[in-house]
C-alpha cells in the first residue's frame, strides 16, 4: 500500500486444558503456552506495531501469591520486547534456583507469566495516546479474584461519549476518556453487580464468607454480564477478557465487522484475529479453524468448558472488506484467492484503456500488499492472450509455422518496477525537505521501459494519494513511459471509517477532494453550504434518525468523473507522461469478496446507526475547519 494507514489491532487468546506438567512431558517445556502466544502475536504483527501486551492467570494459587502477570511495550519492536522481558524473568528465576528446572509446581509458584489462560494484543492506535498506558491488555484490579478483569480487543465504538456519560451517571469517575476504559468499566460494573448479588444469595443460604468465593466462580454467568454491558454498544469489535478466577470470553460485534477465529482440541482453546496465525502456530488445516459467529461470545469457564452463546442478535453481516483487500495477512487461503480475483476483475477495464495493445504495455505493482492482486491481473492478461492466439490460429487456415511461432511468442511484459527502499523517518520538519525524502521512499528499476510503452502499476487502494503524488508518479515518470496507468484494486474511498481504521477525516480523502473540485468546476459548490445546514440540523437527533447527506453530493457525479478528477489532482504538474487512475467497481469488489460485504468507506452504507452520526460529524468538522475526530 502506498499510503501509510494505521488500522486494526490483533487479539490472541490461549486456554490450556491440561495441567502444566502435561505440556512439560509432551512438549518438553512448561512454557508451551507462552511460546504459542509468541507465535500467535508475531504472526499478527501486521495488525499492530505501536505496542504489544501479554497477560496470564495462574489457577489455584495460595493467598498471598501473585496469580496475574502482565507486561506491555511500546518499544520499536514491541512483540519482541514483551517476550524478551518474559524470557529474562523466567531465565533469571531458573538461574537463581536450579531446583525449579524440573519441578513444574515450583515453576508455577515462583515464576511469573506461567499460567493456564493467556491474553495477548498487538496495537495500532486510533484513539488515545501511544504510551504504554494505552496498550492492552487493560487490568481492573480487585482483592476478590472474580472481580479482577483483564481486557484486550480490536474495536472502535462510535458512541464513546454516550457510554462514558452513562458511567458518570452511575456515579463512577472513569480515569480516561477512551473507548477501552469505557468498555472495561462497563463490563466491570455489571461484573461487580452480579458478584454482589451471588454473594448475598449465598449468605442467605448459610455459607460463610470464605465458602462463598469458590461458589461465586461456579455461579457467575458471563453471558448475562456481557448482554447487559454491550446492549448500548455501537461499533465494530472483537473483545477478549479474562476474569481473575479463570473464566474467559471473546465477544464479536453483531455485524461481524471485526474478524475472529478459534480452534479447540483436548489440549487447548485458541482464538486469534486471523486464521493463518492459528494455522501456523498449531500446524492445522483450514477446516479445523472456525469463525466466531457475529453477535456471539466464546465463553470458557475455569473448568475448561467452551460454550458459544448469542449475546446480541446478529444483524446483516457486514464484515470489513478492507480486511481482505489490505489489512489481513495474504497467506490466508481465501484472502489470497480474493486478492487475485480483484486483480482479475479489473483487467477488462485496463485492456480497454490500453486499446488491447499488450506488446507496448508493461505490468507491475506497488510493493508489497498489491503483489497478490498483481498475480491475478497477470493471470487475466495471460487468459486474454491465450484466447487471442487461439482465435488467430483457428481463423487463419493457411497459417505457416513461422506465423504460428510469431503469434505464440506474444507475451505480457511483466517487470518489477517499484521497490520499497526505506521506511521514511520524518525527522525533518521543514515541508520542502520532507517532501524530497518522501519522493525517495520507493526506488525503481531502470532500463526496461521504452518511450512508446504504457506502464500499468497496481496498488491495493488509494486513500489520501499523498505518496502517489509526491513519490510514486514522479518516480515512474523518470522511466520515460508514454503513459502511466495506476490501478487501485479497491474502489474509491469516499467516506470516513469509525470501526478501527485511521480514516476519520473526510477532507484527507482524495475522493472527497475530487468531489469538492467537481462541485467548483460545475458551479455547484453552494451545495456544500446547504449540506452543512442539513448536517447541523440533525446533530441532536438519535443515531437511528440521522441521514448520510454526503451520499447526495457524490450522487451528482459518476465514478468515472470522480476518477478523472482524482487523476488530475494527483498528476497535474507532476509528470510528463499522460496519467490515468483506474478504480475497482463496487460490484466487482463484492464478487471477489462475497463474504465480506462491509463497504461503508466506499458506499457510505454504514452497518451501525453510529456510522451515519460519524459521517455527519465529519462533514461538520470539515466545513468548520475543525480537525478533531468525528467520534
What are these regions (language model features)?
Residues 1-293, 299-362, 366-367, 376:
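Conserved short alpha-helical segments that host acidic/polar catalytic motifs at enzyme active sites
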Residues 91-101, 198-215, 388-405, 527-539:
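Intrinsically disordered, low-complexity domain-flanking/linker segments in eukaryotic proteins
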Residues 150, 454-457, 483:
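Hydrophobic "anchor" residues on beta-strands that sit immediately upstream
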Residues 167, 381, 385, 475, ...:
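Active-site catalytic pocket residues across diverse enzymes, especially alpha/beta-hydrolases
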Residues 230, 245-247, 252, 264, ...:
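PRPP-dependent phosphoribosyltransferase catalytic core
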Residues 241, 252-253, 273-275, 302, ...:
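Active-site proximal loops enriched in glycine and acidic residues that flank catalytic Cys/His/Asp
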Residues 336-432:
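Conserved PRPP/pyrophosphate-binding segment of the phosphoribosyltransferase/PRPP-pathway fold
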Residues 363, 370-377, 414, 445, ...:
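Extended, hydrophobic alpha-helical segments in both membrane/secreted and soluble proteins
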Amino acid at each position: 500500500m502506498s499510503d501509510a494507514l494505521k488500522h486494526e489491532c490483533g487479539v490472541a487468546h490461549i486456554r490450556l486444558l491440561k495441567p502444566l506438567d502435561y505440556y512439560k512431558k509432551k512438549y518438553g517445556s512448561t512454557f508451551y503456552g507462552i511460546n504459542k502466544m509468541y507465535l500467535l502475536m508475531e504472526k499478527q504483527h501486521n495488525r499492530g506495531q505501536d505496542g504489544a501486551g501479554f497477560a496470564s492467570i495462574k489457577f489455584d494459587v495460595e493467598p498471598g501469591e501473585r496469580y496475574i502477570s502482565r507486561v506491555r511495550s511500546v518499544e520499536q519492536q514491541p512483540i519482541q520486547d514483551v517476550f524478551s522481558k518474559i524470557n529474562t524473568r523466567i531465565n533469571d528465576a531458573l538461574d537463581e534456583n536450579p531446583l525449579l528446572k524440573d519441578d513444574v509446581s515450583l515453576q508455577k509458584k515462583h515464576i511469573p507469566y506461567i499460567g493456564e489462560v493467556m491474553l495477548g494484543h498487538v496495537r495500532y492506535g486510533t484513539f488515545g495516546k501511544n504510551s504504554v498506558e494505552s496498550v492492552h491488555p487493560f487490568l481492573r484490579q480487585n482483592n476478590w479474584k472474580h472481580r479482577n478483569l483483564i481486557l484486550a480487543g480490536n474495536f472502535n465504538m462510535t458512541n464513546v461519549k454516550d457510554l462514558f456519560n452513562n458511567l458518570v451517571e452511575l456515579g463512577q469517575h472513569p480515569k480516561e476518556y477512551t473507548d477501552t476504559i469505557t468498555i472495561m468499566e462497563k463490563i466491570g460494573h455489571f461484573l461487580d453487580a452480579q458478584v454482589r448479588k451471588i454473594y448475598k444469595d449465598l449468605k442467605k443460604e448459610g455459607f460463610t464468607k470464605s465458602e462463598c468465593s469458590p461458589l461465586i466462580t461456579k455461579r457467575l454467568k458471563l453471558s448475562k454480564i456481557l448482554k447487559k454491558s454491550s446492549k448500548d454498544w455501537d461499533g465494530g469489535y472483537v473483545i477478549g477478557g479474562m476474569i481473575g478466577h479463570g473464566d474467559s470470553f471473546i465477544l464479536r460485534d453483531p455485524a461481524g465487522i471485526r474478524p475472529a477465529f478459534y480452534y479447540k482440541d483436548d489440549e487447548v482453546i485458541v482464538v486469534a484475529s486471523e486464521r493463518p496465525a492459528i494455522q501456523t502456530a498449531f500446524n492445522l488445516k483450514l477446516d479445523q479453524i472456525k469463525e466466531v459467529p457475529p453477535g456471539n461470545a466464546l465463553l470458557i469457564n475455569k473448568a475448561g468448558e467452551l460454550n458459544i452463546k448469542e449475546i446480541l442478535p446478529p444483524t446483516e453481516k457486514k464484515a470489513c472488506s478492507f480486511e481482505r483487500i489490505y489489512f489481513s495477512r495474504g497467506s490466508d487461503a481465501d484472502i489470497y484467492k480474493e486478492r487475485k480475483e480483484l486483480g482479475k476483475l479489473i483487467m477488462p477495464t485496463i485492456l480497454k484503456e490500453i486499446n488491447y495493445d499488450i506488446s507496448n504495455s508493461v505490468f507491475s505493482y506497488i510493493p508489497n500488499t498489491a503483489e497478490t492482486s498483481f498475480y491475478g491481473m497477470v493471470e487475466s492478461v495471460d487468459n486474454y492472450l491465450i484466447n487471442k492466439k487461439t482465435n488467430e490460429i483457428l481463423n487463419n487456415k493457411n497459417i505457416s509455422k513461422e506465423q504460428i511461432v510469431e503469434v505464440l511468442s506474444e507475451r505480457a511484459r511483466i517487470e518489477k518496477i517499484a521497490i520499497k527502499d526505506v521506511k521514511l523517518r520524518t525527522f525533518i520538519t521543514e515541508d520542502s525537505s520532507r517532501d524530497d525524502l518522501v519522493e525517495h521512499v520507493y526506488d525503481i528499476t531502470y532500463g526496461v521501459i521504452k518511450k512508446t510503452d504504457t506502464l500499468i502499476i497496481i496498488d491495493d487502494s488509494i486513500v489520501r494519494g499523498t505518496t502517489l503524488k509526491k513519490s510514486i508518479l514522479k518516480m515512474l515518470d523518470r522511466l520515460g513511459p508514454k503513459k502511466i496507468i495506476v490501478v487501485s484494486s479497491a474502489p474509491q474511498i469516499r467516506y470516513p471509517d469509525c470501526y478501527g481504521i485511521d480514516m476519520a477525516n473526510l477532507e484527507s480523502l482524495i475522493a472527497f477532494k475530487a468531489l469538492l473540485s467537481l462541485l467548483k468546476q460545475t458551479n455547484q459548490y453552494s451545495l456544500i453550504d446547504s449540506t452543512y445546514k442539513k448536517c447541523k440540523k440533525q446533530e441532536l437527533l438519535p443515531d437511528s434518525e440521522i441521514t448520510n447527506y454526503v451520499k447526495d453530493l457524490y450522487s451528482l457525479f459518476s465514478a468515472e468523473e470522480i476518477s478523472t478528477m482524482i487523476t488530475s489532482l494527483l498528476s497535474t504538474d507532476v509528470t510528463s507522461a499522460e496519467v490515468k487512475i483506474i478504480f475497482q467497481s463496487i460490484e466487482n469488489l463484492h464478487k471477489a469478496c462475497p463474504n465480506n460485504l462491509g463497504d461503508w468507506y466506499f458506499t457510505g452504507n454504514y452497518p451501525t446507526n453510529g456510522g451515519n452520526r460519524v459521517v455527519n460529524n465529519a462533514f461538520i468538522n470539515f466545513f468548520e475547519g475543525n480537525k478533531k475526530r468525528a467520534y
